[in-house]
């Protein structure tokens, strides 16, 4: 029953992936490419989270937190000389955010905070004013607000219960943009579209779709595929650049991708693309289970003797071999490949080993990606 359920889930996952691949073969340019001049930028800052209920940094173990508290209070005009703080209501954190392209001053961003010291939870805390800088050292945003933590941590004298991560959280709309990134979009004459998944077929198809649009609107070609990732678009003399990009990004093109099998060995996840093919190959799979159990026996000394209580080790080892079924795999289609794998009756971890062996044998006509 468990094998049938496992097979059904694998079939459902792979067929669902194939359905998505077919459904999204035709996509808008905005969904598969982005402007080279309109990329995201990473911001980072160092700050303090206050208002924690005794779950912050211990100042002896995290001296940088103590230094930061004193520096913050001095900036606020409060003298800290001669004082010895023992609070655990403050935590030092790193604050990160992503600055989107064309973001204007006054806009807001979500920020992520993560503990640097030995704080046990950031739940209920408030991030105080923290400047966020880019790779050039310039300050582009300032963050402040209540920290939202998804996990929880509760403990007593003899037990502890935790779920999720409590030492990291988010501040929704917690950062205000103070500086605009320099952009040459309005003054540019040549724009470059970058494919998120590089592919020569998709790049050539994108250039052809843009040229068909340009021939109808401007009477000439304006796009050229530079390589598998980049498509150059030249602005016509009388065209408005914003209007041109609005029309171009809504053009529908046929996308393509190489055959690929993605395997995550930690979680047992397997994703098989629609174009994956397997040459005819025979596969035999068997599992060996070894179980070692320890049941020590307590030996008591005789009454009124000088002996001591001792124990005798008792080890039991059991080995069981399962499987050994031979199946012929010939993946002329995704459905036949999944049916062949399910016929062996193995679990996802076994299928991972089988796919790796088929690739080593040269029968898997696809790229094998291990995560």
Swiss-Prot record:
| Gene Ontology BP terms | bacterial-type flagellum-dependent cell motility
Keyword Signal attached = yes
Q: Name one GO cellular component term.
A: bacterial-type flagellum basal body, distal rod, P ring
Localization per record: Periplasm; Bacterial flagellum basal body
Chief localization: periplasm
Share what the entry says about its subunit structure, partners included: The basal body constitutes a major portion of the flagellar organelle and consists of four rings (L,P,S, and M) mounted on a central rod.
- Function noted in UniProt: Assembles around the rod to form the L-ring and probably protects the motor/basal body from shearing forces during rotation.
Give the family, as the similarity comment puts it: Belongs to the FlgI family.
Check the UniProt entry and state the signal peptide residues, or none. 1-25
Query: What protein name does the entry list?
Result: Flagellar P-ring protein
Return the PANTHER family for the record: FLAGELLAR P-RING PERIPLASMIC PROTEIN FLGI, FLAGELLAR P-RING PROTEIN
* Pfam family name, one: FlgI
Q: Which InterPro entries match?
A: Flag_FlgI
NCBIfam families per UniProt: PRK05303.1
- Keyword terms: Bacterial flagellum, Periplasm, Signal
What does the record give under GO molecular function? structural molecule activity
């Amino acid at each position: 029953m468990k094998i049938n359920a496992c097979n059904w889930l694998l079939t459902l996952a792979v067929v669902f992936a194939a359905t998505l691949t077919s459904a999204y073969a035709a996509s808008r340019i905005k969904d598969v490419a982005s402007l080279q001049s309109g990329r995201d930028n990473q911001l980072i800052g160092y700050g303090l989270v206050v208002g924690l209920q005794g779950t912050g940094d211990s100042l002896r173990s995290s001296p940088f937190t103590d230094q930061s508290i004193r520096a913050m209070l001095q900036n606020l005009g409060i003298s800290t000389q001669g004082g010895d703080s023992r609070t655990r209501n403050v935590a030092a954190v790193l604050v990160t955010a992503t600055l989107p392209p064309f973001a204007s001053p006054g806009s807001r961003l979500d920020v992520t905070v993560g503990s640097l010291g030995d704080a046990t939870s950031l739940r209920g805390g408030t991030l105080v004013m923290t400047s966020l800088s880019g790779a050039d050292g310039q300050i582009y945003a300032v963050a402040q607000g209540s920290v939202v933590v998804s996990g929880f941590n509760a403990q007593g004298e003899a037990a502890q219960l935790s779920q999720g991560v409590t030492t990291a959280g988010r501040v929704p709309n917690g950062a205000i943009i103070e500086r605009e990134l320099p952009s040459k979009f309005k003054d540019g004459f040549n724009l470059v579209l970058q494919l998120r998944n590089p592919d020569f077929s998709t790049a050539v198809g994108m250039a052809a779709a843009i040229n068909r649009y340009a021939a109808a609107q401007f009477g000439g070609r304006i796009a050229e595929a530079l390589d598998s990732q980049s498509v150059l678009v030249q602005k016509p003399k009388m065209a408005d650049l914003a209007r041109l990009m609005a029309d171009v990004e809504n053009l529908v093109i046929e996308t393509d991708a190489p055959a690929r099998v993605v395997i995550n060995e930690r979680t047992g996840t397997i994703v098989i693309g629609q174009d994956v093919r397997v040459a005819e190959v025979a596969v035999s799979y068997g599992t060996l289970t070894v179980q070692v159990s320890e049941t020590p026996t307590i030996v008591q000394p005789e009454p009124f003797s000088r002996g001591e209580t001792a124990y005798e080790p008792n080890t039991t080892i059991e080995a069981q071999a399962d499987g050994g079924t031979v199946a012929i795999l010939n993946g002329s289609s995704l459905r036949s490949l999944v049916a062949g794998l399910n016929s062996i009756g193995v679990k996802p971890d076994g299928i991972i080993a089988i796919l790796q062996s088929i690739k080593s044998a040269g029968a898997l006509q696809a790229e094998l990606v291990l995560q």
